[in-house]
A protein has these predicted regions:
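Proline/serine/threonine-rich low-complexity linkers at boundaries of modular beta-sandwich domains
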Residues: 1-6, 48-51, 108-120
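Short beta-strand segments of immunoglobulin-like
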Residues: 10-16, 61, 124-130, 170-171
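Short beta-strand elements of extracellular/lumenal beta-sandwich folds
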Residues: 18-33, 129-151
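Short acidic, flexible loop segments centered on an aromatic residue
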Residues: 31-50, 145-162
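Enriched for extracellular/lumenal, surface-exposed ectodomains of secreted and cell-surface proteins
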Residues: 46, 60, 89-99
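Short beta-strand and strand-turn-strand segments in soluble, beta-rich domains
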Residues: 47-59, 158-167, 177
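Short strand-edge motifs at loop-to-beta-strand transitions and within beta-strands
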Residues: 68-74, 177-182
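Short, surface-exposed loop/turn segments at beta-strand-coil junctions that are enriched for proline
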Residues: 77-84
Length: 182
């Protein structure tokens, strides 16, 4: 009985940015030393729906000889709102042996999606008057305009003749969140 399995895969580019396209190459091997696999139908599915095929989700190969290999190429796209994380993608291979017996194999691959970081800030709010020797405080609004959670956000500032190398840890910022650092 022929047995198909994914032995390698490659994504170009190396990872998908949300909203971007890529080409996925999936290398399949028939591990049988006795029979070829024929009428092979490939399909791709990512459970969250954040990775989609550009055209059809399927592909076809007439046969893979015993011990042979085949590379299935499928153009894919990550939707604009895709989460920045590794995504598990199912590859299903439906095929027949030489006698027409229907067989199915399913493998999982991992594709990385990244979201562009968008961190912006308002102008600093200064005290109206600063007297030498006093501690002058200022504040600044920092906004996460991206779709990814930002961790360990650190606001570092250098104010000539007042403060040098001071920092404020804003911590974790969820998408769409603003924090005031002072």
């Amino acid at each position: 009985v022929p047995k198909l399995m994914i032995i390698d895969y490659a994504l170009a580019p190396e990872y998908l940015e949300a909203g971007a396209e890529g080409m996925l190459d999936i290398r399949v091997k028939n591990t049988s030393s006795a029979q070829k696999a024929k009428n092979i139908k490939f399909s791709l599915e990512e459970e969250s729906g954040e990775i989609l095929p550009l055209k059809t989700s399927g592909g076809y190969c007439k046969e893979i000889k015993k011990g042979g290999e085949y590379t299935w190429q499928i153009p894919i796209r990550a939707i604009h709102t895709a989460t920045s994380r590794p995504h598990s993608v199912s590859i299903t291979m439906e095929y027949e042996d030489e006698n027409g017996l229907a067989l199915t194999a399913v493998d999982q691959i991992i594709l990385e999606i990244r979201q562009q970081v968008r961190l912006e800030y308002d102008r600093p709010i200064w005290p109206e008057k600063v007297v030498p020797g006093d501690t002058a405080a200022f504040s600044m609004n920092v906004m996460n305009l991206g779709k990814s959670t930002l961790y360990n956000v650190l606001l570092t500032f250098d104010i000539p003749e007042m403060a040098s190398g001071s920092s404020v840890l804003l911590g974790t910022m969820q998408p769409g969140e603003s924090k005031m650092g002072s």
